[in-house]
Amino acid sequence: MDLRLIFGPTCTGKTSTAVALAQQTGLPVLSLDRVQCCPQLSTGSGRPTVEELKGTSRLYLDDRPLVKGIIAAKQAHERLMGEVYNYEAHGGLILEGGSISLLKCMAQSSYWSADFRWHIIRHELADEETFMNVAKARVKQMLRPAAGLSIIQELVDLWKEPRLRPILKEIDGYRYAMLFASQNQITSDMLLQLDADMEDKLIHGIAQEYLIHARRQEQKFPRVNAAAYDGFEGHPFGMY
């Protein structure tokens, strides 16, 4: 079975690469993103819209309300193995994402050592200026998406349930938006009515939070097996 693995830090174009590869191969994309398993966080987690998918198929490891919390890495890994097994007869899958904990589960599991031909695309972290330009553009799009709720509207809606607030505080983007509101002594719904200067500061702050996360991803990701090549058969990370 052919597995095409696309991974790297946030804001490095993994989803676009996956969509292009899905168009080329006809294979579905399975998201290796635990936060994207919550549809209530669609915009803030970077779930691509129907238009962005361009007719390709995208699968998620779960479909859960936020009140259940973010799916644990171990459970996500079990779901991942199950999905790969289910699609074995279809000839292949594209795996795309950047969950440190999920990729580490893969690196520590012998399941990935046999019966797979690996095609690995590793997206690297760009220099700070390039990254920030891309991240700011992404945040602007999240504030005014072509479809669905904005990241702030998602936050406002979910903030109404106090039991969800601790979960939101653990997620990039939402966390900084809450901090920004607190620092400026405004309520979360007032984030929907910021003037241009304040909005620019919010955008910059969220992008900075993404940069911090991207640097952590770059440091913590498991290393690709030194023996790997296109069509390589063996463990993609050499096991840790």
Swiss-Prot record:
Which molecular-function annotations from GO does this UniProt entry contain? AMP dimethylallyltransferase activity
- Pfam families assigned: IPT
Q: In its keyword annotation, does this UniProt entry include Kinase?
A: no
Superkingdom of origin organism: Bacteria
Question: Which terms are listed as keywords in the entry?
Answer: Crown gall tumor, Cytokinin biosynthesis, Plasmid, Transferase
InterPro entries for this protein: P-loop_NTPase, Tzs
Primary enzyme class: transferase
Name the reaction it catalyses: dimethylallyl diphosphate + AMP = N(6)-(dimethylallyl)adenosine 5'-phosphate + diphosphate
Q: What is its EC number?
A: 2.5.1.27
Query: Does the record carry Transferase as a key word?
Result: yes
Family statement: Belongs to the isopentenyl transferase family.
Q: What is this protein called?
A: Adenylate dimethylallyltransferase
Q: Which gene encodes it?
A: izt
